[in-house]
Regions:
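Histidine-acidic metal/acid-base catalytic patches
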Residues: 1-5, 10-28, 80-87, 145-166, ...
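Active-site mouth loops of central-metabolism enzymes
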Residues: 3-16, 63-72, 101-107
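Active-site-proximal loop/turn and secondary-structure-junction residues that shape catalytic pockets
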Residues: 10-12, 36-40, 64-67, 94-98, ...
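N-terminal substrate-binding region of glycoside hydrolase catalytic domains
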Residues: 21-42, 62-67
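Glycine-rich, proline-tolerant flexible connector loops at the mouths of alpha/beta enzymes
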Residues: 33-53, 98, 102-103, 138-139
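Alpha-helix-loop-beta-strand connector modules within alpha/beta enzyme cores
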Residues: 47-64, 112-124, 149-158, 217-224
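Active-site acidic/histidine proton-transfer and metal-coordination neighborhood
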Residues: 68-163, 173-174, 248-251
Length: 267
Protein backbone atom coordinates (compact mmCIF):
# COMPACT_ATOMS: atom_id res chain seq x y z
CA UNK A 1 0.00 0.00 0.00
CA UNK A 2 1.18 3.52 -0.78
CA UNK A 3 2.73 5.30 2.21
CA UNK A 4 0.68 8.35 3.20
CA UNK A 5 2.12 11.40 4.95
CA UNK A 6 0.11 14.31 6.31
CA UNK A 7 1.67 17.76 6.26
CA UNK A 8 0.82 19.59 9.48
CA UNK A 9 -0.32 22.62 7.45
CA UNK A 10 -3.41 20.62 6.49
CA UNK A 11 -4.83 20.83 10.04
CA UNK A 12 -2.64 23.41 11.75
CA UNK A 13 -5.42 25.89 12.57
CA UNK A 14 -7.17 23.51 15.01
CA UNK A 15 -4.43 21.05 15.97
CA UNK A 16 -1.12 22.03 17.49
CA UNK A 17 1.90 19.89 16.71
CA UNK A 18 1.47 17.49 19.63
CA UNK A 19 -2.19 16.93 18.79
CA UNK A 20 -1.29 16.49 15.14
CA UNK A 21 1.29 13.82 15.95
CA UNK A 22 -1.22 11.94 18.10
CA UNK A 23 -3.91 12.06 15.42
CA UNK A 24 -1.49 10.67 12.86
CA UNK A 25 -0.12 7.85 14.98
CA UNK A 26 -3.64 6.80 16.01
CA UNK A 27 -4.30 6.22 12.31
CA UNK A 28 -1.14 4.24 11.72
CA UNK A 29 0.73 7.09 10.05
CA UNK A 30 4.29 7.04 11.34
CA UNK A 31 5.83 9.69 9.09
CA UNK A 32 4.88 13.38 9.07
CA UNK A 33 5.91 16.69 7.56
CA UNK A 34 6.41 19.45 10.10
CA UNK A 35 6.83 23.22 10.42
CA UNK A 36 9.42 25.13 12.41
CA UNK A 37 6.93 27.74 13.62
CA UNK A 38 4.64 25.02 14.94
CA UNK A 39 7.55 23.42 16.80
CA UNK A 40 8.23 26.79 18.44
CA UNK A 41 4.64 27.00 19.71
CA UNK A 42 4.85 23.75 21.70
CA UNK A 43 8.57 23.75 22.42
CA UNK A 44 11.25 21.74 20.69
CA UNK A 45 11.91 19.47 23.66
CA UNK A 46 8.28 18.37 23.93
CA UNK A 47 7.90 18.01 20.17
CA UNK A 48 10.99 15.81 19.90
CA UNK A 49 9.98 13.76 22.92
CA UNK A 50 6.49 13.00 21.59
CA UNK A 51 7.82 12.26 18.12
CA UNK A 52 10.31 9.76 19.52
CA UNK A 53 7.86 8.21 21.99
CA UNK A 54 5.50 7.53 19.09
CA UNK A 55 8.33 6.11 16.97
CA UNK A 56 7.65 8.60 14.21
CA UNK A 57 9.91 9.98 11.51
CA UNK A 58 9.94 13.29 9.63
CA UNK A 59 9.68 13.53 5.88
CA UNK A 60 9.82 17.26 5.16
CA UNK A 61 10.80 20.19 7.35
CA UNK A 62 9.14 23.49 6.50
CA UNK A 63 11.12 25.67 5.94
CA UNK A 64 14.11 27.94 5.31
CA UNK A 65 13.53 31.34 3.80
CA UNK A 66 12.50 33.70 2.41
CA UNK A 67 15.95 33.99 0.91
CA UNK A 68 16.79 37.62 1.51
CA UNK A 69 20.06 39.13 2.65
CA UNK A 70 18.81 39.73 6.19
CA UNK A 71 17.34 36.23 6.58
CA UNK A 72 20.35 34.13 5.66
CA UNK A 73 21.67 34.33 9.22
CA UNK A 74 18.53 32.55 10.43
CA UNK A 75 18.78 29.83 7.82
CA UNK A 76 21.52 27.88 9.57
CA UNK A 77 19.50 27.71 12.78
CA UNK A 78 16.55 26.24 10.85
CA UNK A 79 18.80 23.71 9.15
CA UNK A 80 20.24 22.65 12.49
CA UNK A 81 16.77 22.18 13.95
CA UNK A 82 15.73 20.14 10.91
CA UNK A 83 18.78 17.96 11.52
CA UNK A 84 17.78 17.44 15.16
CA UNK A 85 14.39 16.21 13.93
CA UNK A 86 16.20 14.01 11.38
CA UNK A 87 14.09 15.37 8.53
CA UNK A 88 14.55 13.69 5.18
CA UNK A 89 14.59 17.06 3.42
CA UNK A 90 14.20 20.77 4.13
CA UNK A 91 12.01 23.00 1.98
CA UNK A 92 13.38 26.17 0.45
CA UNK A 93 11.00 29.13 0.48
CA UNK A 94 12.57 31.64 -1.88
CA UNK A 95 10.16 34.52 -1.42
CA UNK A 96 9.25 36.91 -4.22
CA UNK A 97 10.47 40.29 -5.35
CA UNK A 98 12.26 42.58 -2.93
CA UNK A 99 11.35 46.24 -2.60
CA UNK A 100 11.66 48.11 -5.92
CA UNK A 101 12.74 44.94 -7.71
CA UNK A 102 11.18 44.43 -11.16
CA UNK A 103 13.74 42.57 -13.28
CA UNK A 104 12.68 38.92 -13.04
CA UNK A 105 15.92 37.51 -14.44
CA UNK A 106 18.00 39.48 -11.94
CA UNK A 107 15.74 38.48 -9.06
CA UNK A 108 16.03 34.83 -10.02
CA UNK A 109 19.82 35.05 -10.20
CA UNK A 110 19.78 36.54 -6.70
CA UNK A 111 17.74 33.61 -5.44
CA UNK A 112 19.93 31.06 -7.23
CA UNK A 113 23.02 32.56 -5.58
CA UNK A 114 21.31 32.40 -2.20
CA UNK A 115 20.35 28.76 -2.70
CA UNK A 116 24.00 27.97 -3.38
CA UNK A 117 24.98 29.53 -0.06
CA UNK A 118 22.23 27.69 1.81
CA UNK A 119 23.31 24.43 0.20
CA UNK A 120 26.86 24.92 1.47
CA UNK A 121 25.49 25.14 5.01
CA UNK A 122 23.12 22.22 4.49
CA UNK A 123 25.95 19.98 3.32
CA UNK A 124 27.99 20.82 6.42
CA UNK A 125 25.04 20.09 8.70
CA UNK A 126 24.04 16.97 6.79
CA UNK A 127 20.54 17.76 5.51
CA UNK A 128 19.10 17.72 1.98
CA UNK A 129 17.41 20.74 0.45
CA UNK A 130 14.18 20.54 -1.54
CA UNK A 131 13.07 23.03 -4.17
CA UNK A 132 9.31 23.11 -4.57
CA UNK A 133 8.31 25.23 -7.58
CA UNK A 134 5.21 27.29 -6.85
CA UNK A 135 2.44 28.36 -9.23
CA UNK A 136 3.41 31.24 -11.57
CA UNK A 137 0.64 33.43 -10.13
CA UNK A 138 2.58 33.70 -6.86
CA UNK A 139 5.93 34.52 -8.48
CA UNK A 140 5.81 38.15 -7.40
CA UNK A 141 5.21 37.67 -3.71
CA UNK A 142 6.06 34.09 -2.75
CA UNK A 143 8.35 32.15 -5.07
CA UNK A 144 10.66 33.10 -7.90
CA UNK A 145 11.02 29.47 -8.96
CA UNK A 146 7.85 28.72 -10.89
CA UNK A 147 8.60 25.61 -12.92
CA UNK A 148 10.05 22.18 -12.44
CA UNK A 149 12.32 22.92 -15.39
CA UNK A 150 13.93 25.83 -13.53
CA UNK A 151 14.22 23.79 -10.34
CA UNK A 152 15.88 20.92 -12.20
CA UNK A 153 18.37 23.28 -13.82
CA UNK A 154 19.31 24.77 -10.45
CA UNK A 155 19.87 21.29 -9.02
CA UNK A 156 22.02 20.29 -11.98
CA UNK A 157 24.16 23.39 -11.55
CA UNK A 158 24.62 22.93 -7.80
CA UNK A 159 25.22 19.19 -7.58
CA UNK A 160 24.54 16.77 -4.71
CA UNK A 161 22.44 17.51 -1.68
CA UNK A 162 19.51 19.20 -3.37
CA UNK A 163 16.41 17.88 -5.13
CA UNK A 164 12.84 18.74 -6.07
CA UNK A 165 9.35 18.19 -4.72
CA UNK A 166 6.38 17.92 -7.07
CA UNK A 167 3.28 19.60 -5.64
CA UNK A 168 0.35 18.98 -7.97
CA UNK A 169 -1.29 22.29 -7.03
CA UNK A 170 1.65 24.21 -8.42
CA UNK A 171 2.67 22.01 -11.36
CA UNK A 172 -0.50 20.49 -12.86
CA UNK A 173 -0.73 23.12 -15.61
CA UNK A 174 2.82 22.63 -16.96
CA UNK A 175 3.03 21.18 -20.49
CA UNK A 176 6.56 19.99 -19.68
CA UNK A 177 5.55 18.26 -16.47
CA UNK A 178 6.05 14.65 -17.62
CA UNK A 179 9.43 15.41 -19.19
CA UNK A 180 10.68 17.33 -16.16
CA UNK A 181 9.52 14.67 -13.72
CA UNK A 182 11.41 12.12 -15.79
CA UNK A 183 14.47 14.39 -15.81
CA UNK A 184 14.38 14.67 -12.03
CA UNK A 185 13.83 10.95 -11.63
CA UNK A 186 16.75 10.00 -13.85
CA UNK A 187 19.01 12.13 -11.66
CA UNK A 188 17.60 10.71 -8.41
CA UNK A 189 16.31 14.13 -7.41
CA UNK A 190 12.61 13.38 -6.71
CA UNK A 191 12.35 13.98 -2.98
CA UNK A 192 8.61 14.31 -2.51
CA UNK A 193 5.13 14.26 -4.04
CA UNK A 194 2.46 16.56 -2.59
CA UNK A 195 -1.24 16.16 -3.29
CA UNK A 196 -4.37 18.30 -2.99
CA UNK A 197 -6.62 19.63 -5.78
CA UNK A 198 -7.42 22.74 -7.82
CA UNK A 199 -10.99 23.89 -7.33
CA UNK A 200 -13.19 25.62 -9.87
CA UNK A 201 -13.67 28.39 -9.07
CA UNK A 202 -10.64 29.02 -6.87
CA UNK A 203 -11.46 31.79 -4.41
CA UNK A 204 -7.94 32.35 -3.05
CA UNK A 205 -4.61 31.24 -4.51
CA UNK A 206 -3.09 30.35 -1.14
CA UNK A 207 -5.94 29.23 1.09
CA UNK A 208 -8.48 27.55 -1.18
CA UNK A 209 -6.87 24.28 -2.14
CA UNK A 210 -9.17 21.32 -2.55
CA UNK A 211 -9.26 17.87 -1.05
CA UNK A 212 -8.03 15.25 -3.51
CA UNK A 213 -10.81 14.38 -5.95
CA UNK A 214 -12.77 17.60 -5.48
CA UNK A 215 -11.09 19.51 -8.29
CA UNK A 216 -9.72 19.25 -11.82
CA UNK A 217 -6.18 17.91 -11.37
CA UNK A 218 -5.37 14.57 -13.01
CA UNK A 219 -4.02 13.15 -9.77
CA UNK A 220 -3.70 9.56 -10.93
CA UNK A 221 -1.96 10.70 -14.10
CA UNK A 222 0.65 12.75 -12.26
CA UNK A 223 1.14 9.99 -9.70
CA UNK A 224 1.82 7.62 -12.58
CA UNK A 225 4.44 10.07 -13.88
CA UNK A 226 6.38 10.17 -10.62
CA UNK A 227 6.16 6.41 -10.16
CA UNK A 228 7.38 5.83 -13.71
CA UNK A 229 10.27 8.18 -12.98
CA UNK A 230 11.38 5.95 -10.12
CA UNK A 231 9.81 7.72 -7.17
CA UNK A 232 9.05 5.22 -4.41
CA UNK A 233 8.37 7.67 -1.61
CA UNK A 234 5.23 8.75 0.16
CA UNK A 235 2.17 10.59 -1.05
CA UNK A 236 2.07 13.72 1.11
CA UNK A 237 -1.19 15.57 1.72
CA UNK A 238 -0.69 19.33 1.96
CA UNK A 239 -3.89 21.37 1.87
CA UNK A 240 -4.01 25.09 2.65
CA UNK A 241 -7.74 25.73 2.92
CA UNK A 242 -9.87 27.93 5.16
CA UNK A 243 -12.68 25.46 4.50
CA UNK A 244 -10.80 22.36 5.66
CA UNK A 245 -9.09 24.27 8.49
CA UNK A 246 -12.53 25.02 9.95
CA UNK A 247 -13.37 21.32 10.24
CA UNK A 248 -12.48 18.77 12.90
CA UNK A 249 -8.82 17.80 12.32
CA UNK A 250 -9.52 14.10 12.89
CA UNK A 251 -12.23 14.17 10.24
CA UNK A 252 -9.95 15.98 7.79
CA UNK A 253 -7.17 13.42 8.22
CA UNK A 254 -9.61 10.52 7.89
CA UNK A 255 -11.02 11.91 4.65
CA UNK A 256 -7.52 12.57 3.29
CA UNK A 257 -6.45 9.00 4.04
CA UNK A 258 -9.55 7.58 2.37
CA UNK A 259 -9.06 9.72 -0.73
CA UNK A 260 -5.39 8.76 -0.99
CA UNK A 261 -6.14 5.06 -0.65
CA UNK A 262 -8.75 5.36 -3.39
CA UNK A 263 -6.63 7.41 -5.79
CA UNK A 264 -3.07 6.23 -5.29
CA UNK A 265 -2.00 2.63 -5.28
CA UNK A 266 1.57 1.38 -5.41
CA UNK A 267 2.33 -0.34 -8.69
Amino acid sequence: MTNIVINHATVRERADMLTFLRLCVERGLKTVSIWGDEIAKVGETDALSVLRDFGMTVSGYNRVGPLTADSLDRVEAELERAARFEADHVFLFTGGFQANEKDLATARRRVEDSIGKVLDSARKIGVKLAIEPLHPMVTGDRALISSLSHANSICEALGPGIGVVVDVYHCWWDERLAAEIERAGEAGRLLGFHVNDWLLPTRHLLTDRGMMGDGIIDLRGIYSMVRSAGYKGAVEVEIFSTDWWSRDPAEVIDIAIDRCRSLFRAE
